[in-house]
Amino acid sequence: MLLAEARWIGKALARVEPEKLSPLLNVGSGTAETREKIQPWIDREIFAPLRQRGVAIQHLDIQEGEGIDLHGDLYDDAFVARLGGSGYRSLLCCNVLEHVENPAAIAAKLERIIPVGGYLLFTVPNSYPYHPDPIDTMYRPSLEQFVQLFPHCNLVEGAVQNCGTGWDFVERNPLVMFAKVKRRLAGRTEHGGTKGTASFLPWLFKSFKINCVLLRKERGT
């Protein structure tokens, strides 16, 4: 997650009363180390303010790890059904849908977890380089296309957030960029078969843009 994206999320959630958010399920959370040390702005801009407002948070990921409260596969219907019966009032899912084979199917499952009147906040790349975790399908919808994934929700607010360029990212965290370049040089290929490193070079001066949407569920699924 990029800094400008985290700030947008934090500000959007700050405009919703805490009792309408709690408990919140953070889908694709990563570990506590990721949220608090590798990308500390995630906790600083999003989760620390929520905790201060009394919002209960549960972190969900497909893997186990420190700071992950729940782990499971979103393709497992029984697991998703259990989540739907857990009483969550809101859901956060950032930069996950580009890493699944069928983003529409996963979006529909996540929409069902939250009851009518609850809130869902999603982000997904709009214009962003290839980044496998473990795959990247290069799903890069427009904001309008993204909102259409959630037919039972109304858009509260949305934006295509400009998050800087690759050069900005190099200046902020060169060690992370070096690791990414090293991985691409090892021969990872992006969707369609183009070498990742070669395709990344234009992004040094091209804007990273992220679709950010806050939705309110208005209709039952």
Located regions from the model:
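Short, flexible hinge/linker loops that cap or flank conserved catalytic cores
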Residues: 18, 51, 205-206
